[in-house]
Amino acid sequence: MKTLQELTRPNIWRLKPYSSARDEYSGAAASVFLDANENPYNLPHNRYPDPMQRDLKLELSKIKKVAPAHIFLGNGSDEAIDLVFRAFCEPGRDNVVAIDPTYGMYQVCADVNDVEYRKVLLHDDFQFSADELLAVADERTKMIFLCSPNNPTGNDLLRSEIIKVINDFEGLVILDEAYNDFSDEPSFLSELDKYPNLIILQTFSKAFGCAAIRLGMAFASEGIIGVLNKIKYPYNVNQLTQQQAIEMLHKYYEIERWVKTLKEERGYLEEAFVELPWVLQVFPSNANFFLARVTDAVKIYNYLVGEGIIVRNRNSISLCGNCLRVTVGTRAENAKLIGALKKYQ
């Protein structure tokens, strides 16, 4: 791996970050706060939140078994994705490599930041070859993006191939584990210390059921986290989000119950889809969704819209011709979907 300084944009490495009032004083002893030009009325919402989310990171570290210094929190995982481009990629000069198909925001952030985005097509089984991915990289490749379980395909990428990429690549490997809670494959979090060039992304939007609060997590070396904290907006995670996330962590048993139920419902839906005559293939999934190839994705999608049921038409995505992506819902929602599909002509 190149040194962190070699990977970081020179201007970012030299950057002196903005220091907010709450950065300069974060103690608990004071009772009068006249430092941040806040309105003294409308407690507690008149106060700026902790810019480093210390209480939340402490609670999160207990669940994830990762020290707070190795945790970055952002306004959704998309903030972390955008920040790694801004921190490590020189616009108009550097490039990144990613599997295809995968989560679309990697390319959007690359385009926004004027960074070349190189795609390597997955195999027909939606797996990838580390050698093929590495062959596309060159001396200007700063990052490789992997998503496992992958979106929209739903499958876990082969762990051996992921490890090979991490070990053999000189730059940063961003591993998006947004759907890992629904997989039987263990997270790479327990191996974070082994891989100084690894950044793991997770989210509160899926298993935690908190998409509305917009909270994403990045786990990495203390040095990488320091770079991300240097360039983030001062109060990027609001106080209401921090409070709600802490509440969810205090009832983690509930999240585990949801995950168990959703995995059972995924099996129910997959079995039901296999029986539908116009379903050509149901792809194995380790996420809270699955991909199904049908005879006419556009026609079936439009039919479901007419029935008040929305799935995702992935027909235009690489390797996903005539495919629908179906999110696992409650038993009542899933039964309504299957009932509507059984009536489809």
From Swiss-Prot:
Alphabetized Gene3D superfamilies for the sequence: Aspartate Aminotransferase, domain 1, Type I PLP-dependent aspartate aminotransferase-like (Major domain)
Spans through the membrane: none
A GO biological-process term: L-histidine biosynthetic process
Cytoplasm recorded as keyword: no
Keywords per UniProt: Amino-acid biosynthesis, Aminotransferase, Histidine biosynthesis, Pyridoxal phosphate, Transferase
Keyword Membrane: no
Family: Belongs to the class-II pyridoxal-phosphate-dependent aminotransferase family. Histidinol-phosphate aminotransferase subfamily.
Protein name as catalogued: Histidinol-phosphate aminotransferase
Lineage of the species this protein comes from: Bacteria, Pseudomonadati, Bacteroidota, Bacteroidia, Bacteroidales
The gene coding this protein: hisC
